[in-house]
């Protein structure tokens, strides 16, 4: 084999390389939400191990999975500490404020603690 033929073979693409490129699936074109931008066939996007059945990897959970597993005693709280209802019981006994809401406006009274902050409000 001459040097000229060797150069031609090394620069020409091999058949196996072109076959691999044609078999590759299209990638996710848009780098946004993979659920909406992935161009791969969803049927091929499954995960399966020897210990689990195949599952779709694009949609892992839905509302029917909530409460699927019963709680086990190891995860129960060890003690019960109820919250004090002092504020709620006071509102229940005395009623709401004048306009039936809580006072959430900032307090605009003059600050007398520190003379430099006295006229900042």
From Swiss-Prot:
Residues 1-29 are annotated as: Disordered. It comes from the Eukaryota. Microtubule inner protein component of sperm flagellar doublet microtubules. Interacts with CFAP53, ODAD1 and ODAD3; the interactions link the outer dynein arms docking complex (ODA-DC) to the internal microtubule inner proteins (MIP) in cilium axoneme. Residues 1-10 have a biased composition (Basic and acidic residues). Disulfide bonds: none annotated. It comes from Homo sapiens (Human). This is Piercer of microtubule wall 2 protein. Keywords: Cell projection, Cilium, Cytoplasm, Cytoskeleton, Flagellum. One of its GO terms (biological process) is axoneme assembly. The lineage of its organism: Eukaryota, Metazoa, Chordata, Craniata, Vertebrata. Microtubule inner protein involved in the attachment of outer dynein arms (ODAs) to dynein-decorated doublet microtubules (DMTs) in cilia axoneme, which is required for motile cilia beating. Expressed in airway epithelial cells. It holds the Pfam family PIRC1_2. It is found in: Cytoplasm, Cytoskeleton, Cilium axoneme; Cytoplasm, Cytoskeleton, Flagellum axoneme. The keyword Signal does not apply. GO terms for cellular component: axonemal A tubule inner sheath; axonemal microtubule; sperm flagellum. Belongs to the PIERCE2 family.
């Amino acid at each position: 084999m001459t040097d000229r033929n060797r150069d031609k073979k090394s620069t020409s693409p091999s058949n196996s390389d072109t076959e691999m490129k044609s078999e590759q699936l299209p990638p996710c074109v848009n780098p946004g939400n993979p659920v909406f931008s992935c161009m791969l066939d969803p049927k091929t996007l499954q995960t399966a191990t020897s210990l689990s059945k195949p599952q779709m990897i694009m949609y892992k959970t839905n509302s029917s999975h909530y409460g699927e597993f019963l709680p086990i005693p190891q995860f129960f709280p060890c003690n019960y500490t109820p919250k004090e209802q002092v504020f709620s019981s006071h509102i229940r006994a005395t009623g709401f404020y004048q306009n039936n809401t809580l006072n959430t406006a900032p307090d605009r009274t003059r600050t007398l603690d520190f003379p430099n902050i006295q006229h900042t409000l």
